[in-house]
């Protein structure tokens, strides 16, 4: 099915209108059968159709357009804004999140960790750190009244 033309309808009316062919063309089968058996309602209906054809074609095309229109669905997505500084909602069952700037807490039952991670790295070529009380390599020997060292001298 497609839209119908007024010119084609007038041509069908002129040559075959007494048999109602123009009515069948415009999907009006009941009046087409009536015209077929009465010779266009005794020529009177055939003559009146000269004025009715433009309206019949317009009605047919309007029905055709309304049946073949595509429907467009518009979907709107609403997003909840997240403001800086406000806590975000955690999913169900997730542990609570620490506020920014607070030191992380240990999970329940976990061994304690260093508060700030690994010790800082020494620069390349620097001697390794010594335990407390031991003089660094190359330092002067202590002087003064210290107890004598153990063992032979």
UniProtKB/Swiss-Prot annotation:
Q: Does the keyword Membrane apply?
A: yes
What is this entry's stated membrane topology?
Multi-pass membrane protein
Segments annotated as sequence repeats? 89-96, 97-104, 105-112, 113-120, 121-128, 129-136
- List the subcellular locations: Membrane
Q: Name one Pfam family in it.
A: TM2
Q: What is this protein identified as?
A: TM2 domain-containing protein DDB_G0277895
- Can you tell me where the transmembrane regions are? 6-26, 33-53
Provide the residue span(s) of the region labelled 6 X 8 AA tandem repeat of Q-Q-P-Y-G-A-P-P: 89-136
Q: Where is the TM2 domain?
A: 3-50
Biased composition of type Pro residues is found at 93-153
Which family, according to UniProt? Belongs to the TM2 family.
**The entry's keywords:** Membrane, Repeat, Transmembrane, Transmembrane helix
Q: Which organism is it from?
A: Dictyostelium discoideum (Social amoeba)
Region annotated Disordered sits at 85-153
Q: Does the keyword Membrane apply?
A: yes
Q: Which InterPro entries match?
A: TM2, TM2D1-3-like
Q: Name one GO cellular component term.
A: membrane
């Amino acid at each position: 099915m497609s839209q119908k033309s007024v010119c084609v309808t007038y041509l069908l009316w002129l040559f075959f209108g007494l048999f109602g062919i123009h009515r069948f063309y415009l999907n009006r089968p009941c009046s087409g059968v009536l015209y077929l058996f009465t010779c266009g309602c005794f020529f009177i209906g055939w003559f009146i159709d000269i004025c009715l054809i433009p309206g019949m074609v317009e009605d047919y095309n309007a029905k055709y357009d309304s049946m073949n229109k595509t429907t467009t669905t518009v979907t709107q997505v609403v997003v909840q804004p997240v403001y800086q500084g406000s806590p975000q909602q955690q999913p169900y069952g997730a542990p609570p999140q620490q506020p920014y700037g607070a030191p992380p807490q240990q999970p329940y039952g976990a061994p304690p960790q260093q508060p700030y991670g690994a010790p800082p790295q020494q620069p390349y070529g620097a001697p390794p750190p010594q335990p407390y009380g031991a003089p660094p390599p190359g330092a002067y020997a202590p002087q003064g009244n210290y107890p004598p060292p153990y063992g032979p001298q």
